[in-house]
Amino acid sequence: MKWVQKAIKRPGRVHRYLMRLYGKRAFTKDGDIKASYLDKAIKHVKKAKIPKEKKRSLLSALLLAKRLKRMHRK
């Protein structure tokens, strides 16, 4: 799964963003991200007034995190 390392340009970005928005409640005791908070963050980014390029890259990072979370379950 070398493509994962290449796809993740800024490791920890989603974690830091969720921590800033929601604090510790966005994570399980193990430190994993709760899926519901990923969905909330995606909605927040879509509505936020962020510069277009930053919005797109943050949204793609969140969507990749959601996709990887789904892959991990299987």
Swiss-Prot record:
Main function: This extremely basic protein may tightly bind to SSV1 DNA. Essential for virus function.
Chief location category: virion
Any one annotated GO CC term: viral capsid
Keywords: Capsid protein, DNA-binding, Virion
Keyword flag DNA-binding: yes
Top-rank lineage group of the source organism: Viruses
Protein name: Capsid protein VP2
Subcellular location: Virion
Single GO molecular function: DNA binding
